[in-house]
């Protein structure tokens, strides 16, 4: 099928898209890479994609044909670039007939009367590799052209094996002699001489005497020719032309807009179209435009729902061969690369290398802005966008932008509800693979990330990173509103909701909203009255594990949190924090209605209900409502008669701990409430308030019978008995 004509601003339909675009893009990338790396010796093994025998069987005939075409074109690009790097200027300007530039080529053609490459299947011969490549593509050979030789390596699928990925040799059609590099295929000297030229210093084998001499010079430190502009030293005169050609004509096509140089005019054309915003390649279905046609290939298949590459194991289909290759490597049953340190199996060699860096902690890529190090260049590129503020990936649903594509992918699933990753143990689904991985560890108990300071282990690396900041004291996430700092980004996000008033977690039963998910979970249990956590000592049940842990400390008597000011101990850290505020006088929670401040957020919440009149806690026995759950609990004991708080001095029992605390002052003689005017002290706060009225002469309690006024209600009640002749005592 012919490639779609996109070079002149034409529209593209689904029927006009073919796999040739993918082939062209891959070949162009290889050619560009080879040119940039011209200084080093490049072999076909550096750019070839290798398949194992098992992976090859998963490909259907059309996928094998595509693979064959791409590899042949890569091979052609490799041969062309390598030869041009080693010939002089005039040869570079010749078209694709670079074989004719060498006398050795003419001698090589003497094998078959001027025909270098032989097509054994049909008998047709060609003088150039490009001619053979084109001919191979025009033949509808199907599976018959696939070599069945699967020894140590995989042969490129072609009726006449041209090269082998592992040892990488070319076959000269007439004599069948194998060579280690493409230019040497055309060397008559190589055809008549065995591979016996080796250099004893390093043991390398060469096909050409000049290559051997050049290698020997590199060992001896010879630098006979030196190129002045770049200072590159060369050991033989033939190579001296190479830097000249590379500096002068390696990238002859220069963009006038930005000055960037390109090897080929096609690359320059694509670059020029980017600057003025020209996008001649436009799609009929959605109007998506791109400066180059190859950019639309993958996108077109989205509209066409075309996924020609299908995995034979699980049936999953992909738009391109590269997607299938990655899938085959990441398939759970196909993880041939095992880590020698921990035994973990990876689906690809690249993944194994990345995993290996977690053991060595190797981070060779540094940010020039902040100096932070990363394991690979892609992570560094993503990080740099934090400094530049670039967010190229935008959500089509809500317009939110992201710095990385995976961030957008995860976000889109919040709109679609897609959760493609399912736990095989419990069936729970997740929108990200990392979420599933973390969840699976709850079943296995695996905690691979261990703190070197205290030995505590974690299921995810981010938790370890946050924990490590406890030891270092680092708090990099700071609130711009109040300056409060946090060890993790999630802590800052939750804190910001106290400023914005955002409450994203809403109860489906009553509509009440919360700013923390755990608060919503706690609230939901008030509807279900679920208390799944039971104390093994007294069988008391609780809504969550934290409440149970606090309760257990009543039985054990453990109070690990001690106040440095007064020595008082507490069972939980939050109680110590609240207690410290009694010494400092800090009251950070202020009522916006009346301005009254409180030491704890729970006290503020209860206070606000005095303004709103809200009483969400209702007694099922009598229907009485309360503003706080603790008041409801105390009230229920009036029905049950329960008095769990007993005085150790006199044995008196009370329904609430606060009542016991106040009663205890009778035995200790403690009087914490002191008058500032006269210094008189009281053990109850209401008694101090009554005393203060003697200074203000406030008399608000008036007798209805005689009009006499009193300072407090108890005095009025005592006076009322005079009018009723009541004598209760």
UniProtKB/Swiss-Prot annotation:
- Gene3D superfamilies referenced in this protein's UniProt entry, alphabetically: 6.10.140.140, Classic Zinc Finger
- InterPro entries in alphabetical order: KRAB, KRAB_dom_sf, Krueppel_C2H2_ZnFinger, Znf_C2H2_sf, Znf_C2H2_type
Zn finger limits (C2H2-type):
115-140, 253-275, 279-303, 309-331, 337-359, 365-387, 393-415, 421-443, 449-471, 477-499, 505-527, 533-555, 561-583, 589-611, 617-639, 645-667, 673-695, 701-723
User: GO MF annotations for this entry?
Assistant: DNA-binding transcription factor activity, RNA polymerase II-specific; RNA polymerase II transcription regulatory region sequence-specific DNA binding; zinc ion binding
Q: Name one GO cellular component term.
A: nucleus
Q: Which family does it belong to?
A: Belongs to the krueppel C2H2-type zinc-finger protein family.
Name the chain's protein: Zinc finger protein 778
């Amino acid at each position: 099928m012919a490639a779609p004509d996109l070079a002149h601003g034409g529209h593209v339909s689904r029927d006009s898209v073919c796999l040739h675009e993918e082939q062209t893009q891959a070949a162009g990338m290889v050619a560009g890479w080879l040119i940039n790396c011209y200084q080093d010796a490049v072999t076909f093994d550096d750019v070839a994609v290798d398949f194992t025998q098992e992976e090859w069987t998963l490909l259907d005939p059309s996928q094998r044909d595509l693979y064959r075409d791409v590899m042949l074109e890569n091979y052609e690009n490799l041969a062309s670039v390598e030869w041009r790097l080693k010939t002089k200027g005039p040869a570079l300007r010749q078209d694709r007939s670079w074989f004719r530039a060498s006398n050795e080529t003419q001698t090589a053609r003497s094998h078959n009367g001027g025909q270098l490459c032989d097509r054994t299947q049909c008998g047709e011969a060609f003088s150039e590799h490009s001619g053979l490549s084109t001919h191979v593509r025009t033949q509808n050979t199907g599976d018959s052209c696939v070599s069945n030789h699967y020894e140590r390596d995989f042969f490129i699928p072609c009726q006449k094996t041209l090269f082998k990925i592992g040892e990488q040799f070319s076959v000269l059609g007439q004599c069948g002699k194998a060579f280690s590099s493409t230019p040497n295929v055309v060397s008559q000297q190589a055809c008549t001489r065995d591979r016996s030229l080796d250099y004893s210093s390093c043991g390398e084998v060469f096909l050409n005497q000049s290559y051997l001499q050049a290698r020997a010079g590199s060992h001896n430190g010879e630098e006979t020719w030196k190129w002045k502009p770049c200072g590159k030293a060369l050991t033989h005169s033939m190579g001296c032309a190479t830097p000249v050609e590379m500096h002068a004509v390696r990238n002859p096509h220069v963009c006038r807009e930005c000055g960037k140089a390109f090897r080929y005019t096609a690359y320059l054309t694509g670059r020029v179209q980017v600057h003025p915003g020209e996008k001649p390649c436009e799609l009929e279905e959605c109007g998506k435009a791109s400066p180059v046609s190859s950019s639309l290939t993958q996108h077109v298949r989205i509209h066409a729902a075309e996924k020609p590459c299908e995995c034979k194991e699980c049936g999953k289909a992909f738009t391109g061969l590269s997607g299938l290759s990655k899938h085959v490597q990441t398939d759970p049953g196909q993880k041939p690369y095992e880590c020698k340190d921990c035994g973990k199996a990876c689906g690809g060699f690249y993944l194994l290398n990345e995993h290996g860096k977690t053991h060595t902690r190797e981070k060779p890529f540094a940010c020039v802005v902040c100096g932070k190090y990363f394991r690979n260049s892609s992570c560094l590129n993503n990080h740099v966008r934090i400094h530049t503020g670039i967010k190229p990936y935008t959500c089509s649903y809500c317009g939110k932008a992201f710095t990385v594509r995976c961030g957008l992918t995860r976000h889109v699933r919040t709109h679609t509800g897609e959760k493609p990753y399912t736990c095989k143990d419990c069936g729970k689904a997740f929108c990200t693979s990392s979420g599933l991985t973390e969840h699976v560890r709850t079943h296995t108990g695996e905690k691979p990330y261990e703190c070197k300071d205290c030995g505590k282990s974690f299921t995810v690396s981010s938790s370890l990173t946050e924990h490590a900041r406890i030891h270092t004291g680092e708090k990099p996430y700071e609130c711009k509103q109040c300056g409060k700092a946090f060890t993790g980004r999630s802590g800052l996000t939750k804190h910001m909701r106290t400023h914005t008033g955002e409450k994203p977690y809403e109860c489906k039963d009553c509509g009440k909203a919360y700013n923390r998910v755990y608060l919503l979970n706690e609230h939901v249990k008030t509807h279900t009255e679920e208390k799944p956590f039971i104390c093994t000592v007294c069988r008391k049940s609780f809504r969550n594990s934290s409440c149970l842990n606090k309760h257990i400390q009543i039985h054990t008597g453990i109070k690990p949190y001690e106040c440095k000011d007064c020595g008082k101990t507490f069972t939980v850290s939050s109680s110590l924090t609240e207690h410290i505020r009694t010494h400092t006088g800090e009251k950070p929670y202020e009522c916006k209605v009346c301005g009254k401040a409180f030491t704890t957020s729970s006290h503020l919440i209860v206070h606000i209900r005095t303004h709103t009149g809200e009483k969400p806690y209702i007694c099922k026995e009598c229907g009485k409502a309360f503003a706080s759950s603790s008041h409801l609990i105390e009230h229920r004991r009036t029905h049950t008669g329960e008095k769990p708080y007993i005085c150790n001095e006199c044995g008196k029992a009370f329904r609430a701990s606060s009542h016991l605390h106040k009663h205890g002052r009778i035995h200790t003689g403690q009087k914490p409430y002191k008058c500032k005017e006269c210094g008189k002290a009281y053990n109850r706060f209401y008694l101090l308030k009554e005393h203060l009225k003697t200074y203000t002469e406030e008399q608000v309690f008036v007798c209805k019978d005689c009009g006499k006024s009193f300072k407090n209600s108890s005095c009025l009640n005592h006076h009322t008995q005079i009018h009723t002749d009541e004598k209760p005592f």
